[in-house]
Amino acid sequence: MASPQPPFGGGSNSNSNTASPSNNLSPTASPLLEGRDSPNLPLTMTASTVLMTLPRDATAALAEAGKFGQEKVVIRFKPVGSAPALRREQVKVSSTERFDTVMTYIRKTLKCRESDSVFLYVNSVFAPALDEVVGNLWRCFKDSTNQLNVSYSMTPSFG
């Protein structure tokens, strides 16, 4: 009759690094190693619930988030350096237009050639991307008079 072995492999013939198939104390397989089809995989909070439709409150909030407070916003142009001044220093632009519309307007008004450079800066601080929406820029960077200040220059002016 075989003598019972201690639970942690204290026998003379046992190797402490390998588990025998008859040992019931071996750990269960890790859920990460079982495969993707295993139903025992833990789910994150975002993956545990699938929403087929959004609740009415969320749908209304998302619809309102894309709208702008004003249909048109006022942009005030300020020349920097040797850039010529514009006749109309303020213009109204649709809040849904992209910033490249503003660039096109400035280039046309200043009668720039294709090879001429024009640099635009919001609040004399940064140059926004041309695909940025004017309404978003106005919402984030308007001044106390509800105008978006755009400086323009023929040479790079601000960092």
UniProtKB/Swiss-Prot annotation:
Cited Pfam families: APG12
Compartment list: Preautophagosomal structure membrane; Cytoplasm
Main subcellular location: membrane
Membrane topology: Peripheral membrane protein
Region (Disordered): 1-40
Record-level Gene Ontology MF annotations: Atg8-family ligase activity
Entry GO CC: Atg12-Atg5-Atg16 complex; autophagosome membrane; phagophore assembly site membrane
Phenotype upon gene inactivation: Displays slower vegetative growth under nutrient starvation conditions and leads to the inability to form fruiting bodies.
Coiled coil: none
The protein's assembly and partners: Forms a conjugate with ATG5. Forms a thioester bond with the 'Cys-116' of ATG10. Interacts with the ATG7 C-terminal 40 amino acids domain. The ATG12-ATG5 conjugate forms a complex with several units of ATG16. The ATG12-ATG5 conjugate also associates with ATG3.
Stated role: Ubiquitin-like protein involved in cytoplasm to vacuole transport (Cvt), autophagy vesicles formation, mitophagy, and nucleophagy. Conjugation with ATG5 through a ubiquitin-like conjugating system involving also ATG7 as an E1-like activating enzyme and ATG10 as an E2-like conjugating enzyme, is essential for its function. The ATG12-ATG5 conjugate acts as an E3-like enzyme which is required for lipidation of ATG8 and ATG8 association to the vesicle membranes. ATG12-ATG5 rearranges the ATG3 catalytic center and enhances its E2 activity.
Protein name (Swiss-Prot/TrEMBL): Ubiquitin-like protein ATG12
Provenance organism: Sordaria macrospora (strain ATCC MYA-333 / DSM 997 / K(L3346) / K-hell)
Chain's gene name: ATG12
